[in-house]
Amino acid sequence: NRPSASAAHRYTIDRHMVEVTSRLGRETPSGGRYDDDHFKALLLAGITHDIGKRAFVADHAAEGARHVPVIFKRMGYAPDIVDWATVLVREHLTLSEFATGKDPYDPAVAEELADRLHHDKMLLDMLFDLTRADGSSLGATAGETITKQYGWSKWREQIVRGMYSAARAAM
């Protein structure tokens, strides 16, 4: 029930992670459906993506990715599910950061994103869905800002989808 240090978050961290998870579905952005194992990994990533957020931690995604495999292995999840969830937690900010902070039309940027996801199109689909769910669960939306940090908007959807498409083409 910790408040977030980021002013973009309206909800406490635990409430935000539940909000994110509630927005995840079986439909992939590429038009398919997640099988049970991929969907399970996506839901697990949703409920734990901000688990690394705590005082004095500079990179909460890396910190979370350090804890996730330990937790999920202890809970008895299959190695693939653990690996996918770990990658998603580690990279849950990457798609949005690349779309807004780099040139999404630069082939080297698309290749870097593809490399981070092991050239796995299903992981890219899952990352897109996690990114969209995370961005739309912040509390700030288009036209509403909290200290000038925006949540999910049509503009953000468009540029993130462009980065997603470029990375998919690089795979």
PLM features: residue spans?
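Amphipathic alpha-helical scaffolding segments
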Residues: N1, A62-E63
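Divalent metal-dependent phosphate-bond-processing catalytic cores, especially two-metal-ion Mg2+/Mn2+ enzymes
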Residues: A7-D14, V18-F39, L44, T48, ...
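Alpha-helical segment that forms one wall of the substrate-binding/catalytic cleft
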Residues: G64-V68
